[in-house]
Each structure stands twice: as C-alpha cells, then as structure tokens.
Curated annotation (Swiss-Prot):
It is found in: Cytoplasm. It is an enzyme of class 4 (lyase). This is Imidazoleglycerol-phosphate dehydratase. It comes from the Bacteria. GO terms for biological process: L-histidine biosynthetic process.
C-alpha cells in the first residue's frame, strides 16, 4: 500500500496555513495555530485517530480566532481528501461514543463524497478560556465541506463546555480512524454498491 500522506497550503489575506497528514501514523502531533484550545483539539484528533498531524498557522488573531479556526478546518478537510485519494479499500464508515467525565458525545461519519453536517452539541458557555465555543461548529463545518464527508454529532450528556467539546473531538478521531482503515477483504475495491464515491 502506498503511503497515505498529503500536504496542503492555504494562503489568503487573513491566514497562512501549512498542514501535513499521515493517515497511517502513530498519533504524533505538532500544532502551532496561535489558538491554544484549537491546538489542544487537534492533538485529540492525532492521538486518538492515530493520524500524524503537522500544522502551522499565522492568522489575523488581532481581530479574533474565527478566520484561523475556520481556515485550519478547511485545510484539514482538503488534506484529508487528498490523503484518502480514490478511497479504494477503506472501511468508509466510522462511529464512536466518547465519554469525558460527565460528558458523552457520539460521532457517526461516512466518507461518502457528500458533505453534510448534523450538529447536535449544546455547549452551555460562550467561551472556554479565550476560545469562542461557536467556533467548534465552524471547524467541523469547514472539515465536512472540504473533505466531502457526512458527519453526525450527538451529545448524550454533559454540563462542562470543555468536556463536551473535547469528547466530541475524541469521538471524531476514533470514528475517523475506523473509517479510513483499510479493509483487506475489499481487496482495493471501492466501498460502494454504485462503484463510485
């Protein structure tokens, strides 16, 4: 099997982002986005998804974190799609429910080629530290749009904002890990009855 490694550069008037993903990694992460909470969440994806992630970003943080947060999501989604290639042999679907203390979040995803986000997180506070919790949805939407995945997030329990968000990223990581794994029984075929994704 060829290495499933990809790099993406995104440069706009608002941000300059470089990202590299290795889908068959060991969970190594180097995240320097200038948004500490986002770095922490990217570390969850790497650690629990066993995806090596290298990302650096310079953005207009003097305005707020929105552009950097969204553009990192865009670059992540584009890089994921590139690393997956034609998707031959992948499992395609993934689901996982992750607890973090009182919080419980379930993620179900399909690397279908059809972008759709069903967002069911109810985060009770506007901020976690300096991070605007509205940006969680913006990150996931950017990933979905640019990787063309279907993503459902459901919160079954949780009262602490940090716990809810982190549980969602851990569940996303584990679901993504299941979906990108190569199924040897597929023998390199596409996981679709249509023969196309």
């Amino acid at each position: 099997m060829e290495p499933r490694i990809a790099s993406t550069v995104r440069t706009t008037r608002e941000t300059d982002i470089q990202i590299r993903l290795d889908l068959d990694g060991t969970g190594r992460v180097q995240a320097e986005t200038g948004v500490p909470f986002l770095d922490h969440m990217l570390a969850q994806i790497a650690t629990h998804g066993l995806i090596d992630i290298d990302v650096s970003a310079q953005g207009d943080l003097h305005i707020d974190d929105h552009h950097t947060n969204e553009d990192v999501g865009i670059a992540f989604g584009q890089c994921l799609a590139k690393a997956l290639g034609d998707k031959r042999g992948i499992s395609r679907f993934g689901h996982f429910a992750a607890p973090l203390d009182e919080a419980l979040v379930q993620v179900v995803l399909d690397l279908s080629g059809r972008p759709h986000l069903s967002y069911g997180l109810e985060i009770p506070t506007q901020r976690v530290g300096s991070y605007d919790t509205q940006l969680v949805r913006e990150f996931y939407q950017a990933v979905v749009n640019n990787s063309s995945m279907t993503l459902h997030l459901r919160q079954w329990a949780g009262i602490n904002s940090h716990h809810i968000i982190e549980a969602s990223f851990k569940a996303f990581a584990r679901a993504l890990r299941l979906a990108v794994e190569i199924d040897p029984r597929r023998a390199g075929s596409l996981p679709s009855s249509k023969g196309a994704l």
